[in-house]
Amino acid sequence: MSYAKQHLAEATAILSQLDPDKLEHMVDLLAAARDRGGRLFILGVGGSAANASHAVNDFRKICGFEAYSPTDNVSELTARTNDEGWPTVFAEWLRGSRLRAEDALLILSVGGGNLEKNVSPNLVEAIKLAKERGATILGIVGKDGGYTAQAADACCIIPTVNPVNITPHQEAFQAVVWHLFVSHPKLKVNATKWESVK
């Protein structure tokens, strides 16, 4: 089998294992946060940070949801990393943003964060703060979901079908899932350009 066929077969297998009911529940939680005047903070590291930035655009433009990602502000991100350290960079940014119970946190991560293994401790600390503040916590994560899956109000775990190709599929399916969210009738309030061109 060619690599292209293998990769597409793996993607098909992942898609068939996603739980539509869980995704609908996540949409309901996002809609509730928006409708009560909450904001959406989307956090990710590496490729997931780029996905977070794209998702912020979609939630703001398509869903009318006030959304932000800390990795969009490079000056603050690097200042906090330099002055306070990488593990607390997102939690401190959320404190500065006055995270409150009405808000929602969406974690995009390949592994979901794990303090014991020192993997994405910044996500773990941000989730802990969100828990303290009573904010809604959501995740689109892979592997076993890490701390995100343990602490979230709702979490989509992208299944691993080939341990050699975890990251490419995780980051690709983050986009599949958040695009499902922003195009969902419960969240979408504005037409996307190409669908509205006559």
What is each residue range found by the language model?
Residues 113-123:
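Glycine/threonine-rich flexible loop motifs
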Residues 60, 124-131:
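Surface-exposed amphipathic alpha-helices with a cationic face
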Residues 18-36:
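A short, well-structured juxtamembrane/interface segment
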Residues 132, 141-194, 198:
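Short alpha-helices
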Residues 31-104:
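Glycine-rich, small/polar surface segments that engage phosphate groups of diverse ligands
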Residues 1-18:
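Generic N-terminal amphipathic, Lys/Arg-enriched alpha-helix
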